[in-house]
Amino acid sequence: MLKINNIRFGIRIVTYPRSDGNTPILLRKTVDSVLSQSYGNWIVYLAGDAYEPASEFNSYSSWFPQGKVRARNIFADPERHKFKDQRWRLYGGISAINKCLDWMHADGISHVAILDHDDIWNHNHLKTLADAYTQFPEAQFVYTAGRHASMGVLPKNRDVQVRYNNLPPMEEDMLHSCASWRLDNIPLRYRYGCRSSGEPQCGDMTMWQDMKSFMREHNLRFYFANKETVFHDGM
C-alpha cells in the first residue's frame, strides 16, 4: 500500500468582489470543497485582490477551522482598476496572485495547489496530488483532469499510463485549479503575456508556457494524474 509522504499543501485562493455580487456564494462552494478533502494536511492562503468591503473579506476566515487559513487583503494595483479593456479579464488578479505566492514561499510552503475562487474540487483532489508526488518524487509539477461546464473534460487527450509521463500542461487544455507545483523549487510568477499575433492572452496560459520552458531548461519533470478532480461551471 502506498505510504503518502507528509506533504503539507498551501492552497492558493485569490478572490475579489464580483460585479454581480456573487462572490460570497461562489467562494463558499469553493471553500466547502476544500473542507471536504479526504487529505487533511493543508492550509489555505486566502488573498483578497483589493477586496472591498474589507469586512466582507474578513468574514471569510470564519468558514475555516482554527489554524487552517491565513488571510490577507492585498492592495497591489489590481488589474480590474488598471485596465479598462479586455486585458482586465485576461490579466485579472496577477498582481495579487504573485504577492500571495511570495507570501507562501516566505512561509516555507513547498507544494502549492491552485484553486480559483469559483471552482470546485472533488473530495479526492489533494489525495490525488499527494499520491502522485509520493509515487513520483522527481515530479515538480503535478496536475489532474477537470470538467468545464461547456467544454467537457480537459485535457482532451487523456490516453496516458500511470508512470512518469512527463506530459506538460497545454495552455488551453487544462483548468487552472487542476495545477500544483513545487513552490520551493520553481520561482516562476505570473506575468502579462501576448499571443504571437500580439493580442493579450490569459495569465495562466502565459504561466504554462513559461513553466514548460523553465522545466525543460532545468530538466525537471511534470506528472499528469489522469483523474477528473475539478469542476468549473464557466460563470
Residue ranges and their predicted role:
Residues 41-51, 74-76:
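Short beta-strand/loop segment that forms part of the nucleotide-sugar
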Residues 26-41:
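Short, acidic, metal-binding catalytic loop of nucleotide-sugar glycosyltransferases
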Residues 147-155, 177, 223-235:
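Active-site donor/metal-binding and catalytic loop motifs
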Residues 109-120:
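Short beta-strand-to-loop acidic/aromatic patch adjacent to the donor-nucleotide binding site
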